[in-house]
């Protein structure tokens, strides 16, 4: 009962857990997941089996090396990403934590290179109207897609516009997806230009089929990486304040 974030459970007179009458369960599943005897079930959760939690993880050195070795990849091969691979990545991302377990994320997947390039064209139309640096314009005119980098797939994260934690939940879930893609050897880069334009340009929203009342908070370009990196570049010194 101590793991229930909403304090929704209490012990009855017989010593068994029961629901608090005026409680507010957030459907996190902690109560079922923590029970060592599989004695609990939860009627409010989706009817799918609980997955076994990892019993043994790689050591901190392995995980730290994986995390700091992650790179933004902007050069992709022509190889498409299989639908089953994209679905596997989304399965990981949908289990990312959300505020109060709200799970309000909606995903948009563009898994066709031709459609991805069409999004770049539409975004470029807006960028030229809004003003773009001569250097970027010159790159575009030479055939270099600096917007979506000729990626074979793009995944965008949305939430309802009136949901206060949409940006945070999207960033966390996209990071889960990015690291899951890295673990599968894929290259990933955040789709900043497309995210920016999707927030202000109706044509992009229509092309993405963003549901009415939803906002795009972020996205990723994905593909088979053309190059691999041998080294991890240095970063600025840590800026920290201990209080």
Regions found by a protein language model. Give the residues of each.
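Acidic, surface-exposed loops and disordered segments
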Residues: 1-243
């Amino acid at each position: 009962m101590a793991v229930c974030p909403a304090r929704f459970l209490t012990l009855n007179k017989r010593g068994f857990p029961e629901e608090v009458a005026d409680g507010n369960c957030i459907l996190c599943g902690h109560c079922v997941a923590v029970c060592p005897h599989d004695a609990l079930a939860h009627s409010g959760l989706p009817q799918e089996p609980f997955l076994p939690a990892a019993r043994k993880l790689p050591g901190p050195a392995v995980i730290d090396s994986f995390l700091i070795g992650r790179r933004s990849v902007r050069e992709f091969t022509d190889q498409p990403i299989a639908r089953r691979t994209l679905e596997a990545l989304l399965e990981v991302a949908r289990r990312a934590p959300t505020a109060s377990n709200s799970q309000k994320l909606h995903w948009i997947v563009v898994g066709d290179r031709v459609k991805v390039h069409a999004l770049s064209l539409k975004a470029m139309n807006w960028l030229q109207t809004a003003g773009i640096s001569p250097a970027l314009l010159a790159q575009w005119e030479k055939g270099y897609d600096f917007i979506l980098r000729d990626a074979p797939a793009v995944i965008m994260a949305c939430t309802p516009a009136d949901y206060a934690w949409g940006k945070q939940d999207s960033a966390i879930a996209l990071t889960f997806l990015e690291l899951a893609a890295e673990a599968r050897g894929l290259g990933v880069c955040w789709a900043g230009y497309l995210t920016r334009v999707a927030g202000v340009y109706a044509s992009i929203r229509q092309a993405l089929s963003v549901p009415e009342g939803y906002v795009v908070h972020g996205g990723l370009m994905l593909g088979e990486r053309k190059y691999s990196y041998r080294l991890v570049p240095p970063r600025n010194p840590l800026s920290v304040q201990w209080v």
